From Swiss-Prot:
Keywords: ATP-binding, Magnesium, Nucleotide-binding, Transferase, tRNA processing. Substrate binds at T11, A12, A13, G14, K15, S16. ATP binds at A9, P10, T11, A12, A13, G14, K15, S16. Its EC number is 2.5.1.75. SUPFAM superfamilies: P-loop containing nucleoside triphosphate hydrolases. This is tRNA dimethylallyltransferase. The gene is miaA.
Length: 304
């Protein structure tokens, strides 16, 4: 079986636009690999493809759960592999598109063979998080395994899970080995020169705030309180707290745009680090990635 193409790039780089163009040209079906577009109602702040775009190119793994639910990497991997198998069974070509490192790694490397959850230990770690803060817990991880600290991407839920396993077993989730992946993948990664990517992030942030992001954040707050501990998964999405503050009148839109842009730039740097260190791929320019994908989809790679 030929490898499944996988397209990744940092946030705001334009991977969805490239996927749509290729999807229309080659009749592809997109398998989304994003931790927050899985949630119904998180549309503007996640830059989710619009209904019109999805009518042109079928997308899978969008709008699959309510914002009140948790959605983890194991659940994603099972759903994504099922969607890929379905697309292939119908004689079509799936294209995995996304920037969530944990999801991409789970597809490419396989799911970690991690012990089941320990509710009592998790509660202890969550209490630690509330009392000491995320930086203290990340420092504990880094002292034992610096690479693991980078891999966790400052995600509180992942940090809690990592320490839950580590304090019980002396090993982190990624140290238990992996279940073999269901498919082989051919990775295509791209980025822009950093000043250009920064400008794209800033412009997109302002556009999303003007398009109704504050109202979307206010709706989310009605569904899931943002101040719960541990922090709800949906409120880990970039920018929603700032957008909510704009709606509440406690933060002006320009200040919110600056804060969101800064956080998004930091996230983009982590994404690029992940691609290089965890996926072992060096990003190329957008045009180089597009040319390579066209060559692959035209038959060179699909016949491998």
């Amino acid at each position: 079986m030929p490898p499944v193409p996988l397209l990744t790039a940092p946030t705001a780089a334009g991977k969805s636009a490239l996927a749509l163009a290729l999807g229309r040209q080659f009749g592809l079906e997109v398998i989304a690999a994003d931790a927050f577009t899985v949630y119904r109602g998180l549309d503007i702040g996640t830059a989710k493809p619009t209904p019109a775009e999805r009518a042109q190119v079928p997308h899978h793994l969008l709008d699959v759960v309510d914002v009140t639910e948790d959605y983890d990497v194991a659940r994603y991997t099972r759903a994504a592999e099922s969607a890929i198998a379905d697309v292939l069974a119908r004689g079509r070509v799936p294209l995995v598109v996304g920037g969530t490192g944990f999801y991409l790694s789970a597809l490419v490397r396989g799911l970690p063979l991690t012990p089941p959850a320990d509710p009592q230990m998790r509660a202890e770690v969550e209490a630690d998080l509330a009392a000491r803060g995320l930086d203290a817990l990340l420092a504990e991880v880094a002292a034992a395994n610096p690479a693991e600290a980078v891999r966790l991407e400052r995600n509180p839920r992942r940090v809690v899970r990592a320490l839950e396993v580590y304090r019980r077993t002396g090993r982190f989730p990624g140290e238990f080995g992996y279940r073999p992946p269901a498919f082989r993948y051919r990775m295509f990664a791209f980025t822009h020169p950093w000043p250009e990517l920064e400008a794209r992030v800033a412009a997109r942030t302002r556009t999303m705030l003007a398009q109704g992001w504050p109202e979307e954040a206010a709706w989310l707050a009605q569904q899931v309180a943002p101040d719960q501990e541990p922090r709800p998964t949906v409120w880990q999405a970039l920018g929603y707290r700032e957008a909510l503050a704009v709606h509440a009148g406690t933060l002006d839109p320009e200040a919110a745009a600056r804060q969101i842009t800064l956080a998004t730039r930091q996230y983009a740097k982590r994404q690029l680090t992940w691609v290089r260190t965890q996926l072992g791929t060096s990003p190329v320019t957008p045009s180089q990635a597009a040319e390579a994908l066209v060559a692959f989809l035209s038959g060179g790679g699909l016949s491998a």
